[in-house]
UniProtKB/Swiss-Prot annotation:
Key words, A-Z: Ribonucleoprotein, Ribosomal protein
Family the entry assigns: Belongs to the universal ribosomal protein uS2 family.
Chain residue ranges for the region called Disordered: 234-259
Stated name of the protein: Small ribosomal subunit protein uS2
GO BP, sorted A to Z: translation
SUPFAM superfamilies in the cross-refs: Ribosomal protein S2
Organism phylogeny: Bacteria, Pseudomonadati, Campylobacterota, Epsilonproteobacteria, Campylobacterales
Claim: Ribonucleoprotein is one of the keywords in the record: yes
Gene name of this polypeptide: rpsB
Amino acid sequence: MVTMKDLLECGVHFGHQTRRWNPKMKKYIFGVRKNIYIIDLQKTLRYFRNTYTIVMDAAAEGKTVLFVGTKKQARASVRDAAIACGMPYVDNRWLGGMLTNFPTIQKSIRKLDVISEMQENGQIDLLTKKEALMLSRQKEKLESYFGGIRNMKKLPDMLFVMDAVKEHIAVLEARCLGIPVVAPLDTNCDPDLITYPIPGNDDAIRSIQLFCREMTEAINEGKALRSGGRDEIVAEDSEEVSTVDADAITAEDFETEEV
């Protein structure tokens, strides 16, 4: 489970410049340093651990978590994290209606499956070169948009979003459908839109990797619980929590980042 050292080393405490912020994030801000907001990592740690448990429990119940992250520095981390825990993902572009108009999205996925099947059984070779090329290009485009959700047969039970501002359409669609959203909250975000917020940097690659890695671990632990390893994992969690108490962390932990 994540520690204060992990958060500091990955730069999770660095927010945006003071001219770019959402006043609703004030309660999560520790101070200012060189016109950069410093996020209160004591709160980050508590929210992180609470959310970790929530995601783990969701996975233990067999729920599906959709990973969303389409900005350049997040794509690979989001995709790899989702694959590592067997969850669907969107890493290219969020198309409006991916949740609220899911039946139409399913039609596009079925079209992708049909073209793939034609390539596998050789039916595509019966077409003209022009027709085969058009289908191949269509498949490539469909795969870039829907490859990560190809096996998602129903709406997800939860979203993990990297950069809630950029992925605001995904967040709004989830809220519209009552789907809970987990997301790191940088200092320019609106915390009211996120069900399970974790105050932290959502731009730095190391910070993104940390968030993704922890979500993957939470989901895999939940799946292990579901398959029967509950007692062993609960014992490990209890030992870890007793080692580092989030409430016991003081301002001294921020000495290297004084404002």
